[in-house]
């Protein structure tokens, strides 16, 4: 059928979210053996093979702007150009075409579907293209545009005509938006034409189907979780408790190190004292033995010598006993220090390790406190937005306009606004919609070279005569 190619990119109409409509649209595309079913429960078992899921949600541009920062930090985009071009991922460059984009994202990434002539040609033609070119290829395919618009409601056509003067683009979105989820090369991919890259949610388990992976992803995204402030507060409490424990352990370890150094110094002093006493006793014994040798040289009687030896032996034994007793007394007076108490367990930590652990805890506490502050601010913004949304501004607007009218400024403001919107541009060109009207102000010359009198001068003269008559 003949189609105006120049009007394809600005003539796509918005479609309703209806499984029957999508199934008929697939038939118009030429696809065989595939239908679309609506799912109300993710946990419900789906019969037959599933080629993909299409997720529908209400599109709000402000919500998308708020999600930009979060998405860039949490979502795993596939940014490799070769990997992106190897799959069918197209940017939505044509407004109101997200329904067709969602269907094509599922169909053209499956190898065991009878695509028909149109989609098979499109798949071959766009192989290896970048996402932007694939988006333009979809928008400039007459069969797709005609099939898409044939299922639109008449209200959609009237809305399109009403908004014909409004600039539409990739980011001035529809009321609803469609996102596709499909398995590609063993990974679950999320394909959204309004995002810069496809999103890889990773592989699924060996003993599960890819639909189970999809259910987990959607449950995490749509599930209602507990208040984050409670979890963050609990985490902050645990971190502060651990900080107190580590600080006490570090202080205890430093004290034990000091006691150990003191005990070692006392032991050294005791050992030195004992050695000194042993040296003194050795000097005393050597002097006594020298006296015995002198007596032996003088050939003293054996009896006297034996007595001296007995006395020496008794003296020696007494000195030994004195040394033993003295050493015992010293040990009693200075008992060895008790071993330092064991710290934490068998594997002890050094003060350096504990100090590093303490710094990490302090850093984690600061981060958690910031998260708690952010959650509190977000909750406060929820309340502010709710107040703005539920507040009735009609009374304020009526009062404001009434005060302007009472002061005589409302009419002037309205007139000024209308004059500004209708003010002609330089060169005599006045905008009238999208058309330009050029007014000719050339003066007509007379035979004597004088210019004709303007109407304004006549009016002024007439007023002057009228004043003179009075």
Swiss-Prot record:
Give the EC number(s) under which this enzyme is classified. 3.4.19.12
Keyword Protease tagged: yes
The active site of this protein is located at 98, 177
Site positions (Transition state stabilizer) are: 92
Q: Where in the cell is it found?
A: Nucleus
Q: Which reactions fall under this protein's catalytic activity?
A: Thiol-dependent hydrolysis of ester, thioester, amide, peptide and isopeptide bonds formed by the C-terminal Gly of ubiquitin (a 76-residue protein attached to proteins as an intracellular targeting signal)
Q: Where is this region: Positively charged C-terminal tail required for binding nucleosomes?
A: 422-470
Q: Residue spans with biased composition (Basic residues)?
A: 456-470
The answer to keyword Nucleotide-binding applying to this record is: no
- What's an example Gene Ontology biological process for this entry? epigenetic regulation of gene expression
Query: What's in the keyword line of the UniProt record?
Result: Chromatin regulator, Coiled coil, Hydrolase, Nucleus, Protease, Thiol protease, Ubl conjugation pathway
Region: Disordered; residue ranges are: 423-470
Q: How does it assemble?
A: Catalytic component of the polycomb repressive deubiquitinase (PR-DUB) complex, at least composed of caly/calypso, Asx and sba (MBD5/6 homolog). The PR-DUB complex associates with nucleosomes to mediate deubiquitination of histone H2AK118ub1 substrates; the association requires the positively charged C-terminal tail of caly, probably due to direct binding of DNA. Interacts (via ULD domain) with Asx (via DEUBAD domain); the interaction produces a stable heterodimer with a composite binding site for ubiquitin.
Q: What is this protein called?
A: Ubiquitin carboxyl-terminal hydrolase calypso
Q: Which organism is it from?
A: Culex quinquefasciatus (Southern house mosquito)
